[in-house]
């Protein structure tokens, strides 16, 4: 009767790794643009998330996709699902 394919209801976000100093954890900065309600100007809002990185493979500057999971620790309820773009080496 209900033969539909199960879809993931977990949220996914794309952001830049700003810190990888912790063991098995990266800090990801998510930026989004919001229109100011009075002035109409678009302003950039940002938020940092701690995400689980089991193999310590991601470096600062990498663009990654994070996915919501069960809480791993007090501040960590996201996991890195894939690398979107590696950091440019200067």
UniProtKB/Swiss-Prot annotation:
Q: Name one GO biological process term.
A: translation
Highest taxon above the source species: Bacteria
SUPFAM superfamilies listed in its UniProt record = Nucleic acid-binding proteins
Q: Which GO terms describe its cellular component?
A: cytosolic small ribosomal subunit
Which GO terms label this protein's molecular function in UniProt? Answer: rRNA binding; structural constituent of ribosome
Which keywords does the record carry? Ribonucleoprotein, Ribosomal protein, RNA-binding, rRNA-binding
Q: Where are the transmembrane segments?
A: none
Cysteine-cysteine disulfides: none
User: Which Pfam families does UniProt cross-reference here?
Assistant: Ribosomal_S17
Q: Does the keyword RNA-binding apply?
A: yes
Q: Which PROSITE patterns match?
A: RIBOSOMAL_S17 (PS00056)
Q: Does the keyword Transmembrane apply?
A: no
Q: What is known about what this protein does? A: One of the primary rRNA binding proteins, it binds specifically to the 5'-end of 16S ribosomal RNA.
Q: What family is this? A: Belongs to the universal ribosomal protein uS17 family.
Instruction: Output the NCBIfam families linked to this UniProt entry.
Output: PRK05610.1 (NF004123), uS17_bact (TIGR03635)
Subunit annotation:
Part of the 30S ribosomal subunit.
* Protein's recorded name: Small ribosomal subunit protein uS17
| Highest classification ranks of the organism | Bacteria, Pseudomonadati, Pseudomonadota, Betaproteobacteria, Burkholderiales
- Which gene specifies this protein's sequence? rpsQ
